Amino acid sequence: MKMNERFWDNLEIILAEKDLTWAELARKVFNGQYVYPSEFNRLYQKLRHYKSNRLMPQTRWVERIVLVLDIDYEDLFKR
């Protein structure tokens, strides 16, 4: 399994364990980066694009995900 696929599979499991939706994750990750709903929607759609195409997100997104979910970086790539 490729690292990017493992990342998305593990993130999906972690979100389920924390009872969070993808939209809630996006709100936490992009907090402070948008004012209007259209700006949030653009960021959320970008996250969905990465997820649906199983692309590895930008390093700063990964770091932010680790921070807002209060998890270890390794949790996203092992399991």
Indicate residue ranges for each PLM-predicted region.
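A short, Lys/Arg-rich alpha-helix, primarily the initiator
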Residues: M1-V29
